[in-house]
């Protein structure tokens, strides 16, 4: 199943610092997901001043439970970066043929 995940950061004064402190671990997780085919695309959501305030992810997992298990271990979850997460099932256009 394919999913569109929109995750908005906490808005407290320390939110960006937590994001930056957890960024390398989060990106290491993304690199693993790219290698195993579960990460299709994604990136940071920016505000009007180019400050990172959230993330969007296009992911593929066998089912919603597998996605939920993955998200629970993401450094942006465990590091209190993402506050609100919206998950929708999607049918995404492939970037390259399989």
Residue ranges: model-predicted function:
Residues 1-98:
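Conserved, structured core segments of small domains
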């Amino acid at each position: 199943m394919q999913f569109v995940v929109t995750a908005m950061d906490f808005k407290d004064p320390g939110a960006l610092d937590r994001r930056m402190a957890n960024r390398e671990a989060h990106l290491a997780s993304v690199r693993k997901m790219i290698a195993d085919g579960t990460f299709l695309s994604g990136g940071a959501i920016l505000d009007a001043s180019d400050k990172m305030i959230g993330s969007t992810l296009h992911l593929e997992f066998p089912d919603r439970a597998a996605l939920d298990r993955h998200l629970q271990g993401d450094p942006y979850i465990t590091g209190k970066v993402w506050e609100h997460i919206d998950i929708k099932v999607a049918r995404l256009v492939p970037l390259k043929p399989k």
